Amino acid sequence: ANLTRGMQLATPERITKVIRDVLKGEVGARVKVYEQTCMRCGACAKACHFSLSHPDDASYTPVAKLDKTIFKMVRESGKLNAEQMRGIAQIAHTECNMCRRCIHYCPVGVDIAYLMSLVRRICNKLGITPTFIQDTANSHSATFNQMWVREDEWIDSLVWQEEEAREEFPGIRIPLDKEGADFMYSVIAPEPK
């Protein structure tokens, strides 16, 4: 549903504006350098599990994905249509998980994961993102976590955990925002729910 709605709003003018806004300045210069530096040697393919799982299909190599996404945006000066962006979004969200293995194989240091993250950013700004990914992005934006846990809910959960733990450990405390603490507890997001 999110892809369909995003595509309806993605006029060629809006697509061009979003791409140009994201790729302006230093970001655009960095992308252009990567595009010109990439030798298209395919060394990155040896590291990509998507490419390795499709050995007879060169379109799954990281360099092919870049050519069909971010490098295409640069070559076309952002002048793409909604259907092209749908294909780009599919590649960005289903053919690369940005594990960064490819970077270690690239002889010239092209940061492929960074480039794919830019593609995802552009898709996100256009609303051409799978619903479950968009929901996670919205949650992070609103609550700084992927489970929609508000700060007051988190504090209530910690108070409750502290009370429960006192049965076994009298006097235990879970201090919040304590400077100079010896330990920091980083919780798994679903835990407070």
Place the predicted regions along the sequence by residue.
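Ferredoxin-type iron-sulfur electron-transfer modules and their immediate structural context
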Residues: A1-H93
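Iron-sulfur-cluster electron-transfer modules
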Residues: G28-E35, K68-K193
